[in-house]
C-alpha cells in the first residue's frame, strides 16, 4: 500500500526535460517559488534523449508528474505528442509547457510570452518594423510569433541549415519572413530595429569570412536593440560585440524567468511574480555578480 504522504509528493512533482539538461535553471526557479509561496512540491531535471522522449511522455500520462517544461531538442515533438494543444502552441508549432488534466496531456508555449515580457522589463514600449533572427529552432518559432504579434512587418531569418529556415518561413508566411544566407546578414543589419540570436552556438566563432567574423555590428544602426535568448553565459559573445559598438542589449535570463510563470500557475494554482529576489537567486546560482 502506497503511503499517503509519498503519494502526495509524487503528485506534486514537475519536471524540466531536455538533452542535455544539466545547464537548466528551471528547477531552481520552481523551487524558489515553491518556497516563497509556501507550497508543497518538487521540481526535477530529466535528461531524455530524442529516442527516449516518447516513452517519457507516456510515463507522464500515468500520473507521475503534474506537468513540466520542455527544452531543446524536444519542443516540436512535445507539441506533436500532446493530446491537446492550445491556440498559442498551434500557432507556433512547438510546446514548452505541459500539464495533465484527467488523463490527457495538454500543451502550450510560453516562450513568446517570456521573450516579450523580458524586453518589456528593460525596454518598455519596444517596437519596430524590421527584425533579424538567427536560428530556426523551437525558440525561433516562438520569437517569430511574438514579433508578428508586435506588428513587425519584416523578419529576416538566418540559419546555418537554410532548408530549416525555409520551412519556418513557409509555416509563418513568406510575406513577412524572408530567408537569407549567413553572409548577407551584415548588409541586412542596416535595416534592423531588433536583432535576436536564438542559437546556442558561439556565433562569433561559428563562421569566419576572409574579412572577419560573419556578423559585423559596425553596419547596424545605432538605435537597434540586440538580444540573445541564451543566458549562460549571461553576456554572450554576441552581446559583448553589440555592447562594444554602443548598442542597447538585453540578455536572455529574463525570458527564462518569465516563460516559467504560466506553467507554474497551471501546476500549482498560483501565478508567481518575477522579482529582483528571484533574479538575484538565479544569478547567484550561475556565479554571476550582476543584479
From Swiss-Prot:
Q: List the disulfide bonds.
A: none
Could you tell me the keywords of this UniProt record? Amino-acid biosynthesis, Aromatic amino acid biosynthesis, NADP, Oxidoreductase
What chemistry does it catalyse, as a reaction equation?
shikimate + NADP(+) = 3-dehydroshikimate + NADPH + H(+)
Annotated GO MF terms: NADP binding; shikimate 3-dehydrogenase (NADP+) activity
Q: Which CDD domains match?
A: NAD_bind_Shikimate_DH
The pathway is:
Metabolic intermediate biosynthesis; chorismate biosynthesis; chorismate from D-erythrose 4-phosphate and phosphoenolpyruvate: step 4/7
Entry EC number(s): 1.1.1.25
Span of the signal peptide = none
Give the record's GO CC terms: cytosol
Q: Where does NADP(+) bind?
A: 135-139, 229, 252
Q: Name one GO biological process term.
A: shikimate metabolic process
Query: What is the active site of this protein?
Result: 75 (proton acceptor)
Going by the record, the broad EC class of this enzyme is: oxidoreductase
Name the domain of life. Answer: Bacteria
Q: Which residues bind shikimate?
A: 24-26, 71, 96, 111, 231
Function noted in UniProt: Involved in the biosynthesis of the chorismate, which leads to the biosynthesis of aromatic amino acids. Catalyzes the reversible NADPH linked reduction of 3-dehydroshikimate (DHSA) to yield shikimate (SA).
NCBIfam families, A to Z: aroE, PRK00258.1-4
Entry's PANTHER family?
BIFUNCTIONAL 3-DEHYDROQUINATE DEHYDRATASE_SHIKIMATE DEHYDROGENASE, CHLOROPLASTIC, SHIKIMATE DEHYDROGENASE
How this chain assembles, per its entry, is: Homodimer.
**Can you tell me which family this protein belongs to?**
Belongs to the shikimate dehydrogenase family.
Q: What is this protein called?
A: Shikimate dehydrogenase (NADP(+))
> Can you name the source organism?
Bartonella bacilliformis (strain ATCC 35685 / KC583 / Herrer 020/F12,63)
